[in-house]
Regions:
Chain A
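Hydrophobic alpha-helical transmembrane segments that constitute the membrane-spanning cores
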Residues: 82-85, 125, 165-194, 235, ...
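Final/C-terminal transmembrane alpha-helix of multipass membrane proteins
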Residues: 255, 260-277
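Hydrophobic alpha-helical transmembrane segments of multi-pass membrane transport proteins
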Residues: 107-150
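Active-site cofactor/substrate anionic-group-binding motifs, chiefly glycine-
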Residues: 67, 71-123
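Selective transmembrane-helix segments that form parts of the transport pathway or gating/packing helices
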Residues: 72, 76, 80, 119, ...
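Short cytoplasmic-facing helical segments at TM-TM junctions of multi-pass membrane proteins
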Residues: 140-165, 251-255
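Short, membrane-interfacial amphipathic segments enriched in basic
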Residues: 15-64, 244-249
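Membrane-interfacial helix-loop-helix connectors in multipass membrane proteins
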Residues: 93-116, 185-226, 230, 234-254, ...
Length: 282, 413
């Protein structure tokens, strides 16, 4: 990048070295990083929309079902485990906070609303990113560096249709279902710690849920998790698909770094988009 | 000459500051086997990737049947590329799919064929490539040779008109290398596709190639027949062909045709004017039957054993030999006249009927099932003088061949 300020014939060499360039170095770095970000964002958006246009085609349904099994069904155990303890901890913490105000009767609504509106979508998305997202990036990355994706091109099989589109659609279907499981098991966890262990009345716990949880809260939770599903699946597929174009590494190392980037970036984007979506929905 | 199937005009490709191909011009003709040779990293695979559209040139144009690909409509490009198939150097098999599923993939994804028809076609290819036992195994469970054959089967499953082979024999032992080349040649004749190979297997690849393209210093420096390449006077010959030939006589242990010519030339210069020499011409008849019945490996085993034996027998008395064609070997006996050569051949045949027949028979008759088959070994001798044309002497020796051995293969032998 050249920084030519003298249009009257200043030498280019003056701008390449010297203290001037040193001062501009941080700006250059920030500028390049921002350009790279915008570039990648644009590319990932095109990637997503191109993949979505390939959703409907022959034999796609079978691949989508296969991916739902892989992303969704195989994640149920870990989701249930995490959600049970999340609900139990939430019940335990909330109970001790509510007791101070004599409001332990609101435990059910507090636990359920926290889970449905916030913790359920976010933790589900993060857990799936860790379990299935990383695997998706590694799988596509290895297929890329071992020329399997090039092989698909040569066989006239569209790689986006064959590899990416089913994963994105499966994520959009699986994430809300898993969130529903997370919410339900989390509420049961809250029930165990609040009612079974701490002695809150069972009827009060359940009634509080029925009274304060609105259908709109549930829908908002699902809207959030669908946004997360699109983000996570796109980021993970994109990172794997373009693992060979990384400037910082090559081969197996590039796949490893792509997987790390996919998980970190997905988690950050989940939290950022959580704030944005929440502010729009409230 | 008719319009080339594929033509490069001044194609240049750069990666950053590095120019890999510079103003490359080449022609590939329909129905032929064209082999691109050159040093590792010279950009041979890149030419194949340009042909199949995985990479676009920075400058220049690629023509398909006389039409520039850059000027074609999307549907025309799709139709053109649909005729092609590509066998990757690293096989590019899907490691999460079995061999059967890998081979079936193009049919499942790009055709509307019924399951039964796909199964029939896939099983036929699996049998042709001798992968029946490996059909339901994963690529990681196969040997390198089996993976190559699986990749070959997948490349041929759609009956393509043009098949690109990127170093199909890399990482294989000499027998397997020649078996794969022989398989490609056989399929090319059978299905009449245009084959474009990238290979290091000099001189073995000459036996199956109609045309050779030599890539050297970022450009195509030679296009022509393997015979024309033998007379090609260019640094490419010294730097590339000589170094590769030195490594490539592993199968038969014999000299390459070019080395044979050089030896012959040296001998002729040393010998006095009018001095005699003899050419012995050997051929293995019904080698194709061996290939059909017992596979390419068995055929290459026979050739290897035959070559090793000829080299051992005649090398000890100053003779030198080369493989002339897939099933033809020639030996030169310098300073020997016809009667001496006949006596040497008599000894050779005697030994041959003893120990050697059993060795070759064992190689040829591996896993005999079904009907018995025979392999005939012929030999012919012709005498030449230092002043005479060696090609004419070879032709004379070929025309005078007689049977010197017959191997009988039958179940239980």
């Amino acid at each position: 990048m050249a920084f030519i300020t003298n249009s009257q014939g200043g030498s280019k060499n003056e701008t390449k070295g010297g203290p001037g360039a040193l001062v501009l170095l941080p700006f250059t770095f920030v500028g390049r990083t921002v350009i790279d970000w915008v570039d990648n964002l644009g590319a990932a958006t095109i990637f997503l929309f191109t993949a979505l246009t390939k959703t409907f085609g022959r034999k796609q349904l079978f691949k989508i079902v296969e991916q739902i099994y892989y992303i969704g069904a195989k994640s149920i155990t870990i989701i249930m485990l995490v959600s049970l303890f999340t609900g139990m901890v939430l019940g335990l913490q909330s109970y001790h906070a509510l007791v101070k105000f004599g409001a332990q009767g609101a435990l059910g609504s507090l636990v359920s609303l926290s889970l449905i509106m916030e913790l359920g979508p976010v933790l589900t998305a993060i857990m799936i990113t860790a379990r299935a997202g990383s695997a998706i990036t590694a799988e596509i990355g290895i297929q890329r560096i071992s020329e399997q994706i090039d092989a698909l091109h040569t066989m006239r099989i569209n790689p986006l249709r064959y590899l990416v589109s089913p994963k994105i659609i499966a994520a959009i279907i699986s994430f809300p279902l898993l969130t529903a499981v997370f919410d339900l098991v989390g509420i049961i966890g809250g029930y165990i710690s609040g009612v079974v262990l701490l002695g809150v009345n069972a009827g009060v716990y359940l009634h509080s849920i029925q009274a304060y949880v609105d259908l709109r809260d549930i829908i908002n939770g699902f809207i959030k998790v669908i946004v997360f599903a699109v983000i996570v699946s796109t980021v993970c597929c994109y990172q794997g698909y373009f693992a060979h174009m990384r400037k910082d590494s090559h081969g197996a190392q590039a796949v490893g770094l792509a997987t790390t980037s996919a998980v970190v970036l997905s988690c950050v984007l989940i939290l950022v988009s959580d704030y944005v979506v929440t502010s729009l929905l409230i | 000459m008719h319009t080339p199937l594929i033509e490069f005009k001044d194609v240049t490709k750069r990666f950053g500051n590095r120019t890999v191909l510079e103003r490359v011009n080449l022609q590939i003709y329909e129905g032929q086997v064209t082999t691109i040779i050159g040093l590792s990293g010279a950009g041979k695979s890149l030419i194949l990737k340009h042909i199949i559209g995985l990479i676009q040139p920075d400058e220049g144009a690629i023509f398909f049947r006389g039409k520039p690909i850059a000027g074609m409509k999307k549907t025309e490009i799709a139709t053109s590329f649909a005729q092609m198939s590509y066998m990757f150097q690293g096989n590019a098999l899907f490691d999460s799919l079995t061999v059967y599923d890998n081979i079936a993939l193009p049919l499942r994804e790009t055709t509307n064929l019924k399951k039964a028809e796909i199964d029939r076609r896939v099983m036929a290819r699996i049998e042709q490539t001798e992968l029946t036992e490996a059909a339901h195994r994963y690529p990681s469970e196969l040997s390198g040779g089996m993976q190559k054959r699986a990749a070959l089967a997948r490349a041929l499953i759609t009956d393509p008109q043009i098949v690109l082979f990127d170093e199909p024999t890399s990482g294989q032992d000499p027998v397997r290398k020649n078996a794969i080349l022989s398989m490609i040649a056989q399929y090319q004749r059978k299905f009449n596709f245009t084959a474009i190979l990238v290979s290091h297997e000099i001189p073995d690849v000459y036996f199956i190639s109609n045309r050779i393209l030599a890539l050297y210093d970022r450009r195509i420096v030679f296009q022509g027949t393997p015979e024309e390449l033998e007379n090609f006077d260019h640094p490419f010959t010294d730097e590339v062909i000589n170094s590769m030939e030195a490594l490539q006589k592993e199968l038969t242990g014999l000299y390459s045709k070019r080395q044979f010519k050089i030896f012959n030339h040296v001998q002729m210069r040393r010998s006095k004017s009018g001095e005699f020499y003899c050419i012995v011409f050997f051929s293995l008849q019904e080698l194709n039957t061996i290939i059909t019945k017992f596979g390419h490996d068995a055929a290459q085993d026979v050739l290897r054993d035959m070559g090793l034996y000829i080299d051992k027998h005649f090398g000890a008395i100053g003779g030198f030999s080369t493989r002339r064609d897939t099933n033809e070997l020639i030996t030169m006996l310098p300073y020997a006249n016809l009667s001496e050569a006949e006596s040497i051949i008599k000894d050779f045949v005697h030994d041959f009927h003893g120990q050697v027949t059993r060795t070759i028979q064992a190689a040829a008759c591996k896993s005999v099932l079904g009907e018995p088959t025979e392999l005939t070994i012929m030999a012919g001798i012709a005498q030449g003088q230092s002043t005479s044309n060696i090609d004419a002497v070879i032709a004379l020796a070929k025309s005078q061949q007689k049977e010197i051995g017959r191997l009988h293969c039958a179940a239980g032998e």
